């Protein structure tokens, strides 16, 4: 029962459909950490009855189940079949799929994490997967189930149209080929068994077939759909990663030693005028972990972090790893690591938990005998888990309070339907969201121009979007700060030329901001 309960908590973060504003990532992040802490508490409560192998099995099954169920959701989304589920499934246009993770590359990474776990199950001998808590199947039936799951997960990956997912599949194929070689060793049930190669080959074939078949079945053009089509067509220049990385490298050159500061990339991108092409959106992440560390913390910190990681990787030599459980852990980290070179999965709860779990697997003992827990370590883990749950609940409550101003009055909690802004003014957390709402619901006048101007300048570091910039421009002109208004106007024109043009056309004298904040905050 312990393993089943822990499995439930470890699977849920991948399937959570809810991400209420104003900052969509907050609730999934808190939910993921609460689930992980509850899983730890379940294991702690079981005391010495839980073996390391049981925990490994539970993690692998949770990754596999999360990927399989998400693949089903993704296929429903791809064919427009999610309306019946209401709020319990995210809804997309036909031809799109991202499960309940709300982003195609995150969905594709989950598919490949699930495939890594499936290969581990395929390679594991009966003494690893047979357990009174898990159903057992005859070998042929078990292989058949693995084949079906490989096809399902690969179809989900293909439905995502994620180029990242395609590259990850190639990386996993290379890693598996390395680990299948006799020189990789044979200890610990390594992935040298022929069924592993068969399952991986089936997964690759299923991906290729699904890439061609899914668009046809959905009434779409196969030449314009899928990861291969997106690889061939590429992105527009202003939205490509090459443009983005070029801008980030320029920003690094401006402040190479200490960087721009944590969370300041979006501000840095807005206030900088580039000589070449400009990335045409708010830029709050470098979409490459080493570059992000460099632009926000400086080159010395980035070099130290990346150098340490490279040294640890070289010492561990994962390409020589003979143990299948550690191979699975390295596979999970490889999928997340590759994704981190193109985006920022480690900013999201499910991937944080997966990365930490994979690191734990690398440290776990290879023995399958029951090991009694050290009492001090056991209770320390329990106390840490309780602290995490308590902290997340406190943060969730304050986030709920901060979000009230973003709702229409009738949808707010009863105690916050009137004087909402005043009542949430003093909450200790999520003050950026509260102050952003204060700014965007205020009417600019000569009396409050100074306060609005100061607040807008501050909020520019939180969300440099058109309505914030326009308040800076209007309040600056009211205060007679013409040079400052011109400074930000040039940057507004460079960053958001269409919005700037509309602002020029519509403004006559002062332009008041909207009376209600939006339901979400751009890129936050």
Regions found by a protein language model. Name each.
Residues 2-22, 30-44, 58-94, 99-185, ...:
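Alpha-helical transmembrane segments of multi-pass inner-membrane proteins
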Residues 53-60, 137-144, 185-202, 369-389:
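Membrane-interfacial entry segments at the cytosolic side of transmembrane helices
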Residues 92-108, 233-242, 283-296:
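Short aromatic-rich membrane-water interface segments that cap or initiate transmembrane helices
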Residues 103, 242-283, 290, 297-303:
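TM-adjacent membrane-interface loops and short helices in multi-pass inner/ER membrane proteins
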Residues 117, 168-176, 321-378:
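Transmembrane alpha-helices of multi-pass inner-membrane enzymes
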Residues 157-160, 165, 177-236, 244, ...:
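A membrane-periplasm/extracellular boundary helix in multi-pass inner-membrane enzymes
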Residues 215-220, 379-419:
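Hydrophobic alpha-helical transmembrane segments in integral membrane proteins
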Residues 418-524:
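C-terminal luminal/periplasmic domains and tails of membrane-associated envelope-modifying transferases
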